[in-house]
Amino acid sequence: MDNIQAKRYLLNKTETIESTPFGPDVSVFKVKHKMFATLSLGKGNEKGTNGKMAGHYCINLKCDPEEAVMLRDVFAAVIPGYHMNKTQWNTVILDGSIPQGEVERMIDNSYMLVVSKMPKQDQQSLLMPL
């Protein structure tokens, strides 16, 4: 999955909007004003990443803490969330090593984790089209 496919998939989630509150280099994706993903191009100088993000688009995704650790163990391109709570967020490096379906599943899970914390009325309106 490349950055264009990722962005398209993110924006296809019900009521998702994109904004750039951290500047033009970081796209933030929110549902009902709650962030569930960011997308940015790694520069290689990100502290604590050993240059893994260099030249690759990366998505920060919310994740169940136990699954977050498991995904990091399985995929070298999944690291603790850069600039995020490392217990509940992963950074997925879009370097082609993770199957597209798996990246989509991680995006879906992030979206659903955020939606599940919303009031029931909001949850119902968001999940109705699914």
Summary of predicted features, one role per range:
Residues M1-L130:
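Charge-dense, helix-prone N-terminal extensions
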